[in-house]
């Protein structure tokens, strides 16, 4: 799909998703606001698309004359980074999550998200994202860390930085990645805890739209596979190298020769493991791929790749090593 100007893209998105109308219907905790909620949310979404690193920089858009004209904002309606943060703090998270899921289903029906499947499956991936960072606290749920800054005189000092993190579940099949939903981490909370909460909330409604959920080495654990497989889907995670299954595949590599991939100088060992069968009510597969050819450094190709999955090994392309 090709797009022209951002104005055309915005017009198309409003036609398919009715964005402005739906954003304007979201609950606004303010009393008689002068700054429309739809303008705030459109600014926030545009900042996310541009991967703007902080709320201050996103909020600066509300002072940009051209951006305000695009939103139809008048000078007396105001708008600042601090005001943007205050409005976002008052959003109803349940409504926002529901709208994101509706957007995914609308994009699927409109043919924007196609079934150019990966591994023969319709895939979504889990990943940790940092939403905003700022030297000003926005809400009680902000996480905090320290950083070193340098002033105009070259003197260094330590300041507190406040930020939010969220685990996102994103559609990965086809040329357009799409965030289906996310879960914000509470202060002191780990990525896996938030991710499991996200999966438990979304997967029952995605059974007809997804086949496979992907994760990095953090997700190579019983709770991830139990949650995904329990929802009737398949899971795949990069091996952490610290499970009983790693010991089993290491022993297999010492005793059995690999299978060589036709047309590629890639060695593959694969096996079924019963290590977590009691908890998962099924076996997991372990696949270890090893590249036997030299690759240019600029390609950043892995020398080895080991994955753990509930998908039958014959479905996975052995050349991924």
Q: Can you say where each PLM-predicted feature lies in the sequence?
A:
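Short, conserved catalytic/metal-binding motifs centered on acidic residues
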Residues: 43, 58, 80, 84, ...
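Electropositive, glycine- and tryptophan-enriched low-complexity nucleic-acid-binding patches
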Residues: 146-209
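Active-site-proximal, Lys/Arg-enriched surface segment
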Residues: 85-174
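Basic, short loop/linker segments at the boundary and entry of helix-turn-helix/winged-helix-like folds
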Residues: 2-45
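Short, structured patches in soluble enzyme cores that scaffold and shape functional sites
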Residues: 171-173, 183-184, 217, 237-241, ...
């Amino acid at each position: 799909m090709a797009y022209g100007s951002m104005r055309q893209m915005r017009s198309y998105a409003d036609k398919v998703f009715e964005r402005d109308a739906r954003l304007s219907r979201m609950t606004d905790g303010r009393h008689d606001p002068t700054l429309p909620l739809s303008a705030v949310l459109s600014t926030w979404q545009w900042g996310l698309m541009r991967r703007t690193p902080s709320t201050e920089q996103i909020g600066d858009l509300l002072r940009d004359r051209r951006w305000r004209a695009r939103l139809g904002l008048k000078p007396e309606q105001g708008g600042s980074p601090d005001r943007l943060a205050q409005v976002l703090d008052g959003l109803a998270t349940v409504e926002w999550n529901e709208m994101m899921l509706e957007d995914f289903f609308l994009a699927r029906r409109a043919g924007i998200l196609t079934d150019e499947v990966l591994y023969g499956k319709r895939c979504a991936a889990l990943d940790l994202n940092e939403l905003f960072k700022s030297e000003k606290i926005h809400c009680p749920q902000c996480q905090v860390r320290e950083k070193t800054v340098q002033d105009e005189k070259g003197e260094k000092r330590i300041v507190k930085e406040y930020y939010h993190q969220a685990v996102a579940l994103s559609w990965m099949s086809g040329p357009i990645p799409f965030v289906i939903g996310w879960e914000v981490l509470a202060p002191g909370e780990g990525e896996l805890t938030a991710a499991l909460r996200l999966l438990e909330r979304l997967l029952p409604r995605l059974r007809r739209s997804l086949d496979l959920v992907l994760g990095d080495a953090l997700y190579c654990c019983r709770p991830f596979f139990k949650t995904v497989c329990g929802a009737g889907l398949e899971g795949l995670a990069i091996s952490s190298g610290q499970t009983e299954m790693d010991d089993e595949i290491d022993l297999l590599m010492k005793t059995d020769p690999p299978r060589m991939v036709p047309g590629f100088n890639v060695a593959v060992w694969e096996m079924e493991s019963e290590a977590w069968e009691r908890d998962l009510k099924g076996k997991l597969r372990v696949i270890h791929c090893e590249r036997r050819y030299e690759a240019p450094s600029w390609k950043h190709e892995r020398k080895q790749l080991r994955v753990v999955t509930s998908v039958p090994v014959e479905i996975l392309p052995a050349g991924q090593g």
